[in-house]
Amino acid sequence: MSKIHDARRVVITGIGVVAPGDVGTKPFWEMLTAGRTATRPISSFDASPFRSQVAAECDFDPAAEGLSQRQVRAWDRTMQFAYVAAREALADSGVTGEADPLRTGVMAGTACGMTMSLDREYAVVSDEGRLWQVDDAHGVPYLYDYFVPSSMAAEIAWLAEAEGPAGVVSAGCTSGIDVLTHAADLVRDGAAEVMVAGASDAAISPITVACFDAIKATTPRNDEPETASRPFDRTRNGFVLGEGAAFFVLEEYAHARRRGARAYAEIAGYAGRCNAYSMTGLRSDGRELAEAVSRALDIARVDPSEVDYVNAHGSATKQNDLHETAAFKRSLGPHAYSVPISSIKSMIGHSLGAICALEVAASALRIEHGVIPPTANLREPDPDCDLDYVPLVAREAEVSTVVSVASGFGGFQSAIVLTEPGRQR
């Protein structure tokens, strides 16, 4: 990692998104810049027994997205999201047929894997949990795929005709950043010229909702779904569960230039830390997240004063938003008080491993379009969250350097720096 300044440079040349609201980067970006929220009462199952009954679900029809009958029947929603997002990224990049298959790889990220299908199929083979020994006669032949997240990378490799490095990253809520850093390392180290990388999670299921209910991490604001997610607001009381996927085509910069590809942004630096402290708790001083941000900026050769925008984790839990505020002050110094910071979780919820990939997509689009989406529902700022969290309304601004961060259960903290392609170091 210390040699990154002298290594090959990595740019994003394709983006594909499946998000609450619609499929594609255009509706995704329009929704964010309009400040529209996707939180609604959960429709995929009866959520009335649960404390939190709202979520940001994707309006996703796999058949309408061109998936085959086998893909519709056999694939978990997480896999379907990943496949469609990767397909969109490949089409956006125009790289198909222009890269050596042996120099093209795949990295997929997920926090929960195929949770929904595991939930459903266990109910089938165990007679709704009444059988101690499951009846495999009622199982499905592809049930094994639900247990191995690597099947997601395999399906995308077949789609991309990628015969190079492949793998999976599962690091909870930092998976979407961490998978991109691993993929970028493979390009920088010369193991690949092109990587298809991203993250997907579709975990709006009874077992997941019950888990977050148990630790009171999700909001019980069921009577106000559209305003339920309130990052940095005095009245915040938990996050909204979401779902989705974002995949990218990462290329070595010279390779992208040779084929005349458009580059959205350069992945200039990244770093991760763990607080080694608690599965769910965060230190109030934000030390580990601050260290990740500082290290990522150092690797990118970016001074804190040069950061134009910060994409916050912004989960709308009491402790996270205070933790982040402290981390930004610690890592950015006086500039923390003037740089715009916002959370798109206020609009699309928290899709676990996928969310920070969606946030990287939004960050790259900010550089492309020069607009900063707002933090929706931020009407009563917490006086202890006293930075510029871009309340309610998007802003036009020249953005050439972005920091995006993520915090995950287990104490994982990750940061990634995106810059305009070809920036002088």
UniProtKB/Swiss-Prot annotation:
Gene3D superfamilies: 3.40.47.10
Full protein name: Oxytetracycline polyketide putative beta-ketoacyl synthase 1
GO BP term, example: antibiotic biosynthetic process
Disulfide feature: none
PROSITE patterns the UniProt entry points to: KS3_1 (PS00606), KS3_2 (PS52004)
GO CC entries: cytosol
Active site: C173, H313, H350
One term of GO molecular function: 3-oxoacyl-[acyl-carrier-protein] synthase activity
Pathway field: Antibiotic biosynthesis; oxytetracycline biosynthesis
